[in-house]
Amino acid sequence: MLRLILLFLISTSSAMAESVVIGMDKEKVAITATFDGSQILLFGAVKRDKPAPSGDIQIVVTIAGPSEPISVHRKAKVLGIWMNTDTVEVDAAPSFYAVATSSNFSSTINDTEDLRYKVSIPRAIRSVGAPMDVLDAASFSDAVIRIRSAKGLYQLLENKVNIDEQTLFRTSIEMP
């Protein structure tokens, strides 16, 4: 089952009463033995009590699969044999994670908001600790991101949320 998080960011500092109404063409995606990919269409509108602010709105959409703990191993050659030499337990890594934005990610969300809402792919992965003898524990989380990104399971889709008339938006996300 996928969970959906939608962050709505306005590029103005004025406080307004706004809400977001969203819909998806699929509420659930069944992963079965015959699953060969799917596409999720997300659409919505910004409901306002006042006229739209000046300036462009920014929208960030995240779609995440269930998080699960995983063990990440580092292989090294020991006496001519490749073997697992280090292991780090990653507490929670989503099985699928996609971030779609209405413009460039760095101009859509700042570091404080990213830290607070855990929007970016590295922040969506929770790795609390590692054995004391592993000095580069962050590289294990990086390996999870690298491997799952190569498989299409982690996606950063910049400029993929279309906004019409500062009110309607839509995006489409491919699941491998």
Residue ranges and their predicted role:
Residues 75-175:
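Membrane-proximal low-complexity regions enriched in glycine and acidic/polar residues
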Residues 2-13:
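Sec-dependent N-terminal signal peptides
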Residues 60-62:
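Beta-strand signatures of extracellular beta-sandwich domains
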Residues 50-55:
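A short beta-turn/strand-edge loop motif at beta-sheet boundaries
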Residues 46-49, 175:
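Short solvent-exposed capping/turn motifs at the termini of beta-strands
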Residues 18-34, 152-154:
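N-terminal edge beta-strand
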Residues 65-74:
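Short aromatic-acidic-glycine turn motif
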